């Protein structure tokens, strides 16, 4: 019985932690990112589809809002591509850089404020967002 409860919990809890970043996707579609320095992620083509190494990528169609909490200092390469239902992003003053292709093809994006603390925006960071 205990094993089944753990399996069910794992299936319904879309959150994870690594040494630098913690994330949680709530039922309302808000992806909250906390921690410090976000790593760069990679993208590759598998069976004709783009696959991204960001841990929340498999949930990309559920993401409607991204809240990056204070303390996160960078947004990594390929962090949030193809989040078609994403409409708003909150970036704190602690962020100084946005990586390559970070928000590419987020075609539903309507609201983002980039703070003055951001001194570097990578190539294609917002490609396909309009």
Residue ranges of predicted features:
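Sec/Tat signal peptide C-region and signal peptidase I cleavage site
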Residues: 15-19
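Consensus positions within tandem repeat domains that build extended binding/scaffold surfaces
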Residues: 76-79, 99-102, 122-125
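Sec-dependent N-terminal signal peptides
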Residues: 4-13
